[in-house]
Curated annotation (Swiss-Prot):
It is found in: Cytoplasm. It is an enzyme of class 2 (transferase). Pfam families: Hexapep_2, THDPS_M. Its EC number is 2.3.1.117. This is 2,3,4,5-tetrahydropyridine-2,6-dicarboxylate N-succinyltransferase. Belongs to the type 2 tetrahydrodipicolinate N-succinyltransferase family. It comes from Cutibacterium acnes (strain DSM 16379 / KPA171202) (Propionibacterium acnes). The keyword Transmembrane does not apply. GO terms for molecular function: 2,3,4,5-tetrahydropyridine-2,6-dicarboxylate N-succinyltransferase activity; magnesium ion binding. It comes from the Bacteria. GO terms for cellular component: cytoplasm. Mg(2+) 2 binds at residue 186. The active site is at residue 202. It catalyses: (S)-2,3,4,5-tetrahydrodipicolinate + succinyl-CoA + H2O = (S)-2-succinylamino-6-oxoheptanedioate + CoA.
Length: 320
């Protein structure tokens, strides 16, 4: 059994732990770790579930050059992940709804996780892929490469209750899907991102993005994340919003907002208010009750109040 402990000094409410099964390469490197029942808080005195030990009795997998080990992992949620098993526990917490996005430290996770070939017989180290393919054919074992990535499909590790997922390849482990969420076939949810309530997702929810209850992400819609382009701002969408088909945002939306189909509103987009004033969209970030549209004759982006509400600028941006 392997044990990973990142901190003994973290407070109980900022710790998590779990018994898991690690896939270990013959050179000692860990490919992945599955935690059937991750827990928050300090670990209890329980021993590893018997079923986990039963899995390890199968011994070495000659096709993949791996074996499984029972691991006991205890982590500090405020510290950065230190190894593969630590990182996988954090991703399990998110997809198991034990932590919401942006509440646990994932700094450096890309450097910790290995890039695996995820196949129908489990993860395989990239250097072993072609040999494993040949060995599988010799053994007449069905063999399909599903994806090559550092992050696996969520449903191969965690299946949250009360959700629908049209294409499992498009939801990464570490996604947070609340009860009542539907991710259609063209939808996508990254790790450390997701929904907090009932939502229809037909577009892309990027890393770090949080979507509120009753909000729909239209087909082909895009929400800027923090993984590409060096962006630091994390986008939050409030309750009861609609991001139209092929629309996109690089600012946060409050509650009851609509971005019309095909309109992409970035932080620097010039927006004309009902009183004729022109502001950067960033000054409206987080504001509620706004309809964003583009005038089809002039191309001007306009913001209109919804439900008899006046548009209010983000006051934080005007404090010196």
């Amino acid at each position: 059994m392997t044990q990973t402990t990142t901190s003994q000094t973290a407070s109980a409410d900022r710790r998590a732990w779990g018994w898991g099964l690690a896939t270990v390469h013959e050179d000692g490197g860990v490919l992945d770790t599955w935690y059937p029942e991750p827990q928050l808080g300090c670990p209890d005195d329980s021993s590893a579930p018997a079923d986990l030990h039963r899995v390890t009795e199968a011994g070495r997998d000659a096709i993949r050059n791996v074996h499984t080990e029972v691991v006991h992992t205890v982590i500090d949620l405020d510290a950065a992940p230190v190894d593969v098993s630590d990182a996988y526990l954090r991703l399990h917490l998110l997809s198991s709804r034990l932590a919401i996005p942006r509440t646990i430290n994932l700094d450096g996770i890309f450097g910790v996780l290995p890039n695996n070939a995820w196949t129908t017989i489990g993860p395989i180290r990239m250097a072993d892929l072609e040999k494993a393919r040949m060995e599988a054919r010799i053994a007449h074992a069905p063999f399909t490469v599903l994806l090559i990535d550092k992050f696996p499909r969520m449903v191969d590790f965690v299946v949250p209750t009360g959700v629908r997922i049209g294409d499992a390849d498009r939801v990464r482990l570490g996604a947070h899907l609340a009860v009542g969420t539907t991710v259609m076939h063209e939808g996508f949810v990254n790790f450390n991102a997701g929904t907090l309530g009932h939502s229809m997702v037909e577009g892309r929810i990027s890393q770090g993005v949080i979507v509120g209850d009753g909000t729909d992400i239209g087909g082909g819609a895009s929400i800027m994340g923090t993984l590409s382009g060096g962006g630091k701002e994390r986008v939050t969408i409030g309750r009861g919003c609609l991001l139209g088909a092929e629309a996109g945002i690089g600012i946060s939306l409050g509650d009851n907002c609509v971005v019309e189909a095909g309109l992409y509103v970035t932080a620097g987009t010039k927006v004309t208010l009902p009183n004729g004033k022109v502001v950067k969209a960033s000054e409206l970030s987080g504001a509620s009750d706004i309809l964003y549209i583009r005038d089809s004759t002039t191309g001007i982006v306009k913001a209109r109040g919804r439900g008899n509400h006046k548009i209010e600028l983000n006051s934080d941006l005007h404090q010196n």
